């Protein structure tokens, strides 16, 4: 057996470990191999994946969903496309995406931590009213000790410029940041997560044949049973999954 064939065999073992691993790209595959003591260059990994037909097409980018309220007073863009964070729960992103289902549309509203790429809250409903966005935020504050002054960034959709949403952030001592009108790159890391969810899970299914409740379960399981806990995250040290990285970093800082 040639060297590339042996490497490809290891790749298939990695892909077989979890159903969700089937969408591993070159960089995540390289990290997965390194975690098993197999160090290879990106070009070597790419060639082996190409020979084994394991390379994937580029993901589709989801279109923007929320509509700006042009008359509303908007907070400034504080993060200015800087999606890095040195501490957890300090810089958070949110938005809404939709998934077509057999019995309507499912709207998904997450809260994303720039520190480690973790989804710390996920609200879903059959409408995209401001209450959905508010629930996303309040659930996060119930489950996490989010410090005063945490930045919560969104686009300038009417849900996020509503008085109730702003009041909720004020009561939680959060600082609101908002993208410019029509500037999707101002919230690019959140949009990237939606693209990941859809490429790795939603686009693999015909959700128009599934009920809203069935799709809710699929999104929930992907997010909390795979993405947060198992999925290699290339921007984290050693490619650690978001939740694993947060816990590992917390142990080191406490030592």
Where are these regions (language model features)?
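Basic, flexible linker segments flanking DNA-binding modules
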Residues: 1-87, 241-251
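RNase H-like two-metal-ion nuclease catalytic core shared by retroviral integrases
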Residues: 1-2, 65-68, 154-156, 162-166, ...
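Mobile genetic element proteins and their domesticated derivatives, centered on retroelements
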Residues: 11, 29, 45, 49, ...
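An active-site-proximal beta-strand-loop segment
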Residues: 81-120, 126-128
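Active-site beta-loop-alpha junctions of metal-dependent nucleic acid enzymes
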Residues: 100, 104, 122-145, 161
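Short small-residue beta-strand/loop micro-motif enriched in glycine and branched aliphatics
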Residues: 118-122, 176-178, 203-205
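C-terminal domain-tail junction helix/linker
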Residues: 170-174, 197-255
């Amino acid at each position: 057996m040639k060297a590339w064939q042996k490497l490809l065999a290891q790749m298939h073992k990695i892909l077989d470990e979890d159903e969700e691993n089937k969408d591993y790209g070159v960089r995540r595959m390289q990290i997965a191999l390194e975690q098993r003591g197999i160090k290879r260059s990106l070009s070597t990994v790419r060639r082996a994946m190409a020979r084994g037909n394991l390379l994937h097409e580029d993901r589709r980018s989801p279109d923007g969903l929320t509509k700006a309220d042009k008359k509303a007073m908007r907070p400034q863009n504080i993060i200015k496309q800087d999606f890095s964070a040195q501490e957890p729960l300090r810089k958070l992103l949110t938005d809404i995406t939709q998934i077509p289902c057999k019995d309507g549309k499912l709207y998904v509203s997450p809260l994303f931590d720039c520190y480690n790429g973790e989804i710390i809250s996920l609200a879903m409903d059959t409408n995209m009213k401001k209450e959905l966005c508010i629930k996303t935020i309040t659930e996060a504050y119930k489950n996490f000790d989010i410090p005063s002054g945490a930045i919560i960034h969104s686009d300038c959709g009417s849900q996020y410029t509503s008085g109730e949403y702003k009041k909720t952030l004020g009561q939680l001592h959060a600082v609101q940041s908002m993208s410019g009108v029509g500037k999707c790159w101002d919230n690019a890391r959140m949009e990237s997560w939606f693209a990941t969810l859809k490429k790795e899970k939603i686009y693999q299914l015909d959700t128009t044949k599934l009920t809203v409740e069935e799709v809710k379960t699929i999104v929930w399981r992907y997010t909390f049973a795979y993405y947060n806990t198992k999925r290699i995250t290339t921007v984290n040290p050693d490619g650690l999954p978001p939740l694993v990285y947060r816990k590992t970093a917390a142990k080191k800082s406490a030592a």
